[in-house]
Regions:
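Cytosol/matrix-facing amphipathic helices and coiled-coil assembly/linker segments
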Residues: 1-45, 128-143
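Solvent-exposed, non-transmembrane helices and loops of integral membrane proteins
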Residues: 1-8, 87-138
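Phenylalanine-focused residue identity feature
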Residues: 9, 13, 45, 55, ...
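Broad hydrophobic/π-residue packing in well-ordered secondary structure
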Residues: 11-14, 18, 24, 60, ...
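Histidine (H) residue identity feature
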Residues: 12, 20-21, 91, 108, ...
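Alpha-helical transmembrane segments and their immediate juxtamembrane boundary regions
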Residues: 19, 23-86, 149-195
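Loop-to-transmembrane boundary segments
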Residues: 122-160
Length: 195
């Protein structure tokens, strides 16, 4: 990447873009934590309805969807950092995964190697800008394909669970009103007659 006029405008532009991405990451984490809390509370309250034959099917449906939503929300906030390899780092600017500004990359380097890479970058404005642009790009891809993708699934699963559980409950009530008793799961042993 060739930079014609590195200056304060470019620095401000790159800094603001990076700050925006970091704020989006924080918002995604906050939303995932909210979904974890809400789905966990709903799941906890719903478990009590499993023993009631009138609500069993709706409760099972809601529990399944809440659990799936919790898993998606956890996956959204779960850190993904490559473990250090024994092969050493590849210091190749042509490698799209090479980003010495990200700790997941420089944990593969010795301090001397990292100092050398950073010295070269800070003394070459074009390379420094390329590293910053690459970091913004990889952070944006991570947000789009990892955080927000699974966060969206968490919210969709939770909303679907609420709607489907409501429909299941309405169907069970309709069947009972028609005199058809839906099949019940006996989670609690029946008490003996007369005892």
């Amino acid at each position: 990447m060739k930079v014609e006029n590195p200056g304060s405008f470019l620095d401000h532009f790159l800094r603001q873009t990076r700050i925006h991405h970091v704020q989006l990451s924080g918002m995604a984490d906050m939303k995932a934590n909210m979904m974890l809390t809400v789905a966990s509370v709903v799941l906890t309250f719903t478990v009590g309805y499993l023993a009631d034959p009138a609500f069993q099917w709706a409760a099972l449906t809601l529990i399944a969807f809440c659990f799936a939503s919790i898993v998606a929300a956890i996956y959204s906030v779960m850190p993904r950092v490559p473990l250090p390899s024994k092969n050493g780092a590849r210091h190749d600017m042509k490698d799209p995964n090479y980003n010495p500004l990200f700790f997941g990359t420089f944990i593969h380097m010795t301090l001397e190697e990292y100092n050398e890479v950073m010295e070269h970058a800070v003394n070459d404005p074009s390379e420094a800008v390329e590293l910053m642009v690459r970091e913004i790009y990889t952070l944006g891809c991570f947000l789009a394909y990892r955080k927000y993708r699974y966060l969206r699934w968490a919210y969709l699963l939770f909303l679907s669970g609420l709607l489907i559980a409501g429909l299941v409950q309405a169907l069970c009530v309709l069947l009972l009103n028609l005199g058809i008793e839906p099949w019940h799961i006996h989670l609690v042993p029946a008490s003996p007659a007369g005892g």
